[in-house]
Every structure is written in structure tokens, then in C-alpha cells.
């Protein structure tokens, strides 16, 4: 059955290895409590009633995913990921060819709040381009001298935002922009950058700064703290 605007599919690129975590286990399979980071990230998406399907792109030879309860979840589809994030996202988009709108969410971003997700999804009612969750920059920003550990100058932080996920776009538009950007050799660091490359200006939807991505070892304890606090607040 074709998806409608009321239904949203999500793509989670989970084929990375996360070398900065300094662990043999890919970071998305590290545990916080009784769930892996990947499970926390996916369950946050499925908690919203509009999200009816999640496509997870995993690396070839990944033997860990099959051991998770997610592997047997009726709303989960698994595809082979690629060498780069954009390749994995495109593989996921191919699996939801009939979807009108698609979320893309980091596999290692487990602290997504439902109110943030709801605000992001609401933009589909009046946007043809989509948007991303983002957090305004609060710290003083410095640009370094190329190749040196020295300050070149201070960067004006007004209008600077940290790009977060999920990012939310019309499926066909995202597919076309990613394909064009890759074919033309553009540097794609997130899905929004592919749309920017093609001349579009996605919306910035302010989200919570504690929607962190687990990238370094110290992030794991911080994510555990945020998740534990959220669970306690929901039970209160």
C-alpha cells in the first residue's frame, strides 16, 4: 500500500564503524542500559504514530544486527549499506520508493525527544523542501590556522546552528539531490548538504541540545545520563 502524507518512513544509516570510539564494536551496537544505541535510536522513531516503517542500512558481514530483537520487528526493513553515509541513505530510499516523506536519523543518536520529532514532522503540512532538527550555537567559535593548533580568528556565532537529526525531506527530492551531488563529486556531510548543493534551503527546526550523537568515548556516559533522566521524567 502506498504511503500517504500521514505516514512517514525513516532511514537509519548504520553501516559505519565509528573509529573515534576506540572500540572493536561499532558504536551503534554499544549498550546503554539493556538496549544498544541503535535500538534506542530506532525506538525513538517508532514511538511516533506517523512513523510506520524504518529501513536500517547495515554493513555487509554485519553479524550483530541479527541478534537484536529489531531483526524480527514487523516495521523494520534491513538493506545493505554502502561505503559512505550517502550510499547507505540512497539504499534505504530505494526500499521506500512509494513514500512521500522520509526521515533520516543517525544510528548513534539515541536521545531524540518526542516533542522535537513532532515539531519536525509538522513541517510537512506547509513545506515542499523539508527541514532538519538543529540547535543554535552557544559557545564562542574559533577558526584554526590550517595545519596548526593556533587560532586564526573568532567566528561570529549569530545564525550558526549545530545540525542534528532526524532530517526530514520529500523522498523524491532527497533521492534526486543525493544522486546529483554524488555524481558531481560534491562533499556530502549530511542529507541537508545535498539539498543545499542543489540550491534548496531546508528549514531549521530548533531541537534540544541533548539530542547528542555518540561519537567519542566520553559521549557514552553523557547519553546514558540523558536517557536515564528522560525515562524518569516520563514515569513521573
Curated annotation (Swiss-Prot):
The record marks 20, 27 as: Transition state stabilizer. Its EC number is 2.7.7.60. This is 2-C-methyl-D-erythritol 4-phosphate cytidylyltransferase. Pfam families: IspD. The record marks 157, 213 as: Positions MEP for the nucleophilic attack. GO terms for molecular function: 2-C-methyl-D-erythritol 4-phosphate cytidylyltransferase activity. Pathway: Isoprenoid biosynthesis; isopentenyl diphosphate biosynthesis via DXP pathway; isopentenyl diphosphate from 1-deoxy-D-xylulose 5-phosphate: step 2/6. It is an enzyme of class 2 (transferase). It comes from Salmonella agona (strain SL483). The keyword Nucleotidyltransferase applies.
